[in-house]
UniProtKB/Swiss-Prot annotation:
Pfam hit, one: Ribosomal_S7
Family: Belongs to the universal ribosomal protein uS7 family.
Annotated protein name in UniProt: Small ribosomal subunit protein uS7
Entry's Gene Ontology cellular component terms: small ribosomal subunit
Key words of the record: Ribonucleoprotein, Ribosomal protein, RNA-binding, rRNA-binding, tRNA-binding
GO biological process entries: translation
Single annotated GO MF: tRNA binding
Described purpose of this protein according to its UniProt entry: One of the primary rRNA binding proteins, it binds directly to 16S rRNA where it nucleates assembly of the head domain of the 30S subunit. Is located at the subunit interface close to the decoding center, probably blocks exit of the E-site tRNA.
Superkingdom per UniProt: Bacteria
Quaternary context: Part of the 30S ribosomal subunit. Contacts proteins S9 and S11.
Gene this chain is encoded by: rpsG
Amino acid sequence: MSRRHAAEKREILPDAKFGDTVLTKFMNNLMIDGKKSVAESIVYNALDRVQTRLKREPLEAFHEALDNVKPSVEVRSRRVGGATYQVPVEVRTERREALAIRWLITAARKRNENTMEERLAAELADACNNRGTAVKKREDTHKMADANKAFSHYRW
């Protein structure tokens, strides 16, 4: 790791349809081989499906799904005297968002529906209702942190 100053954060522009920067981050994470227009159409079509399925504002549903997946604590490995402990650590706000986005996309890709927009819509709808693989991933992370609460004094 460089000892110079940290790299400056790039400004992320809001998306075209909703004017939301978090949605742009989501699209950027979904994008494969630089095909942003494909990622945009997948996300917008998925949000339309979520709107018809849940009968509510698509952006509001997206943010609720993201909030339901965001972890508050995670475990990090810490070596102390030859033993490696899983130390529970609170997750920074930026990382919470990044993890939630990553987990939602990974969970959607693993689903069995035919198209990616169907999978993404189903996963977002499930996350809105506190179900689904992405929410389970958050629960598992919290359980791990809770199980290793005894090592929380090893924080750094």
